Amino acid sequence: MKTWPAPTAPTPVRATVTVPGSKSQTNRALVLAALAAAQGRGASTISGALRSRDTELMLDALQTLGLRVDGVGSELTVSGRIEPGPGARVDCGLAGTVLRFVPPLAALGSVPVTFDGDQQARGRPIAPLLDALRELGVAVDGTGLPFRVRGNGSLAGGTVAIDASASSQFVSGLLLSAASFTDGLTVQHTGSSLPSAPHIAMTAAMLRQAGVDIDDSTPNRWQVRPGPVAARRWDIEPDLTNAVAFLSAAVVSGGTVRITGWPRVSVQPADHILAILRQLNAVVIHADSSLEVRGPTGYDGFDVDLRAVGELTPSVAALAALASPGSVSRLSGIAHLRGHETDRLAALSTEINRLGGTCRETPDGLVITATPLRPGIWRAYADHRMAMAGAIIGLRVAGVEVDDIAATTKTLPEFPRLWAEMVGPGQGWGYPQPRSGQRARRATGQGSGG
């Protein structure tokens, strides 16, 4: 496999970047659109949808279940019924949203559906969700990939207890389909911790937008009443988690990066993202439907609890590795990342140390002491976030090469081009020189890849 030479930024990065739609919001909208169609409420449209491997896997899954998805690029329409054909088989790839959102949907059908995925996906946690479906009366063969869901055309619902300590997607997957259960659903989280709670809040917010009656007023308990899921138009926000990699370029280079279309009010964890950037002395400015981040002249190590936003960990770890030499950063609340696309804690520790850094694992996180890094190969482990972290480190460390930049197709197929355009020509990529007088580069992703 050919390595990708990460562009360096010897001067402050100054760029405007347009990132495609949110993967998390796109795949939730697709599931809700499928449920509305299955209830006979009509077709839903999704505008600004992300087109990446994860969302293509979701589109394929819905079509496997018998639904119809029309449209090109980022404009999609979902219609039809849940009527899987004989031998229906869903490929989850490495997509946690497909792995955990689609089985409850398949349980509403009347034909067995087999689920499988990439070899690496077979280590991702799924047993608590399958056990919950069994508790609700669904016949499920298997305890992990591959497994089979044997629906009988309806699902009574009721009350279920589940330990979602390994993934908040267990809760979201149940809640998304719950309004179509005969008696609705009450979900009680029984674990000691709940990672990525903002993503459950996103699920609840989108359910309300679809007219679903959901009560999440009691901590660790959610109740969805049976009823209609409205067909509607879904407008997808830019993917703010993907945007963090680009904003990190402003932080590590002391430059200025503007993200277009940044929402004033978001179903994504925008407040958590901005709080971390400010903790690193970045200046954050909302203006003209965009977000501008001005990086500091330098920053020291930092302590941050990433329990709510574990997806940011690789980017934040890269920032920690590039802090003032000798300063220490402590990243906590992220033990659950050991069950993500790869064991992200082990992967980050290994790769930072291989480049001469100092990183060690703790029971629930990482401790990183910033030390001068050297050139070398940064391994992505087929993980999109790991690949992006390598790109961030490469901004400051000449000679870093990412072994699998194609891993970014999972959520941002155009990442290499957007990154190169942001950093600018002459840094290892043959892009045209900016026009005379052009002050800031613009990198635009249309989300049509994958």
UniProtKB/Swiss-Prot annotation:
Binding site for phosphoenolpyruvate: 23, 96, 124, 169, 344, 385, 410
One GO term (biological process): aromatic amino acid family biosynthetic process
Enzyme Commission number, as recorded: 2.5.1.19
Renumbered residue ranges of the record's region Disordered: 426-450
Location (main, coarse): cytoplasm
Binding site residues for 3-phosphoshikimate: 24, 28, 167-169, 196, 311, 340
Active site (catalytic residues): 311
Gene3D superfamilies (alphabetical): Enolpyruvate transferase domain
Record field: catalytic activity: 3-phosphoshikimate + phosphoenolpyruvate = 5-O-(1-carboxyvinyl)-3-phosphoshikimate + phosphate
Signal sequence region: none
Molecular functions (GO terms): 3-phosphoshikimate 1-carboxyvinyltransferase activity
Keywords: Amino-acid biosynthesis, Aromatic amino acid biosynthesis, Cytoplasm, Transferase
Compartments it resides in: Cytoplasm
Pathway(s): Metabolic intermediate biosynthesis; chorismate biosynthesis; chorismate from D-erythrose 4-phosphate and phosphoenolpyruvate: step 6/7
Disulfide bonds: none
Keyword Cytoplasm applies: yes
CDD domains membership: EPSP_synthase (cd01556)
A Gene Ontology term for the protein's cellular component: plasma membrane
Quaternary context: Monomer.
Physiological role: Catalyzes the transfer of the enolpyruvyl moiety of phosphoenolpyruvate (PEP) to the 5-hydroxyl of shikimate-3-phosphate (S3P) to produce enolpyruvyl shikimate-3-phosphate and inorganic phosphate.
Similarity remark: Belongs to the EPSP synthase family.
Name of the protein in question: 3-phosphoshikimate 1-carboxyvinyltransferase
Species this chain originates from: Mycobacterium tuberculosis (strain ATCC 25618 / H37Rv)
